[in-house]
Each structure stands twice: as C-alpha cells, then as structure tokens.
Amino acid sequence: MRLCDRDIEAWLDDGRLVITPRPPTERISGATVDVRLGNQFRVFRGHTAPFIDLSGPKDEVSAALDRVMSDEINLPEGEAFFLHPGELALAVTLESVTLPDDLVGWLDGRSSLARLGLMVHVTAHRIDPGWQGRIVLEFYNSGKLPLALRPGMMIGALSFEPLSGPAARPYNRRQDAKYKDQQGAVASRIDKD
C-alpha cells in the first residue's frame, strides 16, 4: 500500500523520509511528491564504436563506456537543455532523497510530458530502501520535435511504499552499491557488476 499525502507529510515531519529541499505542500498530491529537474546532464558523444559488449571483460566495457559518455554538463541558470528526437540523455533531480530501510520509492514521469514523447526513466524507476542521493533520470525523446528542458521544471513524481519490515540489505549498507550517495548525472557503471 502506497503512502497517501497525509502520510507522506507525516514521514517528512518526523524525519523518516527526507527530501531536500523539502517540497512545499502544494507539490504533495494524493499519493505523490513532485520533483524538479536539476542542472546536471550527461549525453552520448559522437562515436564510432559499433557496439558495447556488456558481457565482455570489465576493463573493455569500462573503456568503451568512457569513449561514448560525455563528461557531466552543468547547465548555467536560465539555459535550456535540448533533447532531440531519438536521443537518450541522463539528468538528475534537483531534490536529494533519503529513504529509510523500510520504504521503497517509485519515480513516474508526468503525463503531460509523456504526451510530447518524453520518457523520464527508460526502465529504472525503483528507489531502493536505504537510498540516499539525487535520482538520475534517463530521458528519451520518442516524439517528433526537440524538447527544451529547463532546470527547476517539474519533471516527475515520487510515490512511496512501506515494506513488510526493514530491509536486511538496504542500499546504503551494500558493499556493491554502485551509485551510493550520487549527487550528479552518473553514467552507467555496468562494468562494476
């Protein structure tokens, strides 16, 4: 059962759930909290690699990822990031989220943006119990027109679901947690699997 607006506010009030900066009441609806777009992005460089062998040796996968992913782009205030049709880009929420060990979060895109072809997460929309950090967004433009994305715009909504008990292996205590405390648009770390 997902938390309703009253429960979300109660969890925020007593510090079990932390969202920084804390969202105002008008950004908390019946079962979700609106999140905004941050100013950090990462894109694929122009490259000549015919493919990335995801099951290949880790050092080769790592080298291939380094060749195709850009450095992080920090967009100055007031500027837009243009996502063209058929392009994938990584971005990050403005808000940082900390979940307790007995709560899982879910990220959903906004319907109004989806109707323009913008996918906010390609497949990864679960936020693990024990998560702490900003949420990376996997943008894909499946529409026909370039989309101007501006830091601070409402980009998605989080919902929260209590677990039957505290997780034995929450994300923040796992030794293999690849994105622990992430604050920027971190590229894939599949080579760390």
Curated annotation (Swiss-Prot):
> CDD domains in the record, alphabetically?
trimeric_dUTPase (cd07557)
| Reaction catalyzed | dCTP + H2O + H(+) = dUTP + NH4(+)
| Free-text function comment from the UniProt entry | Catalyzes the deamination of dCTP to dUTP.
Among NCBIfam families, the record links this protein to:
dCTP_deam
This protein's encoding gene: dcd
The ranges of region (Disordered) come to: 169-193
Protein name in UniProt = dCTP deaminase
What's this protein's family per the entry? Belongs to the dCTP deaminase family.
| Quaternary context | Homotrimer.
Binding, dCTP:
R110, S111, S112, L113, A114, R115, D128, V136, L137, E138, Y171, K178, Q182
Q: What class of enzyme is it?
A: hydrolase
Q: Does Hydrolase appear among the keywords? A: yes
Q: In which pathway does it act?
A: Pyrimidine metabolism; dUMP biosynthesis; dUMP from dCTP (dUTP route): step 1/2
Q: Which UniProt keywords apply?
A: Hydrolase, Nucleotide metabolism, Nucleotide-binding
Active site, UniProt feature = E138
Top-rank taxon, per record: Bacteria
